[in-house]
Amino acid sequence: MEAFVSGGAGGVGAAAVVGVFVAAAVVGGFVAAVALAERAGVIAPRKRPNAPPAVPGLPIIGNLHQLKEKKPHQTFTKWAEIYGPIYTIRIGASSVVVLNSTEVAKEAMVAKFSSISTRKLSKALTVLTRDKSMVATSDYGDFHKMVKRYVMSSTLGTSAQKKFRDTRDMMINNMLSTFHKLVKDDPHVPLIFRDVFKDELFRLSMIQSLGEDVSSVYVDEFGRDISKEEIYNATVTDMMMCAIEVDWRDFFSYLSWVPNKSFETRVFTAEARRTAVMRALIKQQKERIVRGEVTKCIL
């Protein structure tokens, strides 16, 4: 500073330049702070023309405190009665548009499909789907169209339907027999339809995919045989439970570097168990193919 003062006019000019840089830094920092505050929800975001109504929330967390359930469809329905079939909510640092009617969802999925062809998955689904390797969760493109065509032809096509007709008839007969037996054993006890459907649908999927109703399989990673119930838990139940696991880092992307060990342990352990069981089932199927025991199946 003494050099600027002693420098006369030159010092005054240098001081002016420094003042300009300081002012620019202050203004830039203020703009950045406003942008971050708006993104975090501390201040209200700028209104966009024709934007859907927004559900009021709290700073930073948005509407997260109102979505305590893992399946918050009832909350969405209540909001639809107030704000209409289209509205926006804030989940942490992100804004989400909620479509809450059949007509609006159909328009979005059909007429506006190109605008939502890229699927934003949670961290749990990213792990469970092997980074969008499953057709239902993959981005719309060549891979999605190719795999969807294969799935449709091999499982839902006319020839596939005819090939597995007897298997479906067997499933229906098994369900009816089970229901009749339950009613006969105790007519006054309510029937739990879900358990019967679960057992028979899983049996159907095993027969169609592997050609037999697998009762057990040896898993190298476990060092033992696992039962059919354990196969179901590893390939179905655990996946459904992990799919709705919430990782708070999904809502605050700027904190994604913070570890969440409990979440990661649950999801990666379930995925590893699923992989081990599927590898064992495929290995067993290859051995059956070599022995000539496989008749009609998808795999």
Curated annotation (Swiss-Prot):
Q: Which tissues and organs express this gene's product? A: Expressed in roots and panicles.
Q: Which GO terms describe its molecular function?
A: ent-kaurene oxidase activity; heme binding; iron ion binding; oxidoreductase activity, acting on paired donors, with incorporation or reduction of molecular oxygen, NAD(P)H as one donor, and incorporation of one atom of oxygen
Q: How is it placed in the membrane, per its record?
A: Single-pass membrane protein
Mind listing the GO biological process terms from this record? ent-kaurene oxidation to kaurenoic acid; gibberellin biosynthetic process
| Places the protein is found | Membrane
Tell me yes or no: is Nuclease among this UniProt entry's keywords.
no
A GO cellular component term found in this entry reads: chloroplast outer membrane
Q: Where are the transmembrane segments?
A: 16-36
Keywords linked to the UniProt accession: Membrane, Transmembrane, Transmembrane helix
Return any one Pfam family short name. Answer: p450
Q: Name the principal localization, coarsely classed.
A: membrane
What is the similarity comment for this entry?
Belongs to the cytochrome P450 family.
Name of the protein in question: Ent-kaurene oxidase-like protein 1
